[in-house]
């Protein structure tokens, strides 16, 4: 793989839900120039959550997609680089850590934050 297909950062964040964007904001504010890699649908499960009633700072109910848009814009505003790619493998055996995307791009990082969230695994039971 040639040098142009490798991108290095101090902090690489995988996942664009609330945890990923929060990590990105704090890393950017610490001048670490983070890169956040997100999939096709950024925002995680919060993008399909209608009413969010337990987020600090909001006395009224807010909408999940709106909150994720706000978090994304804040992460960008403080200097986070957002990249759309799907990470298919990571190598944590040595530093710098390495993540390989479906795009063929190789991401290397001194620190790696994996915040890929959760996915429901439905039981095959009748209701």
Please describe what each predicted stretch is.
Residues 1-14, 30, 35, 82-127:
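FAD-binding core/adjacent interface of flavoenzyme oxidoreductases
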Residues 3-78:
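Beta1-alpha1 glycine-rich phosphate/pyrophosphate-binding loop at the start
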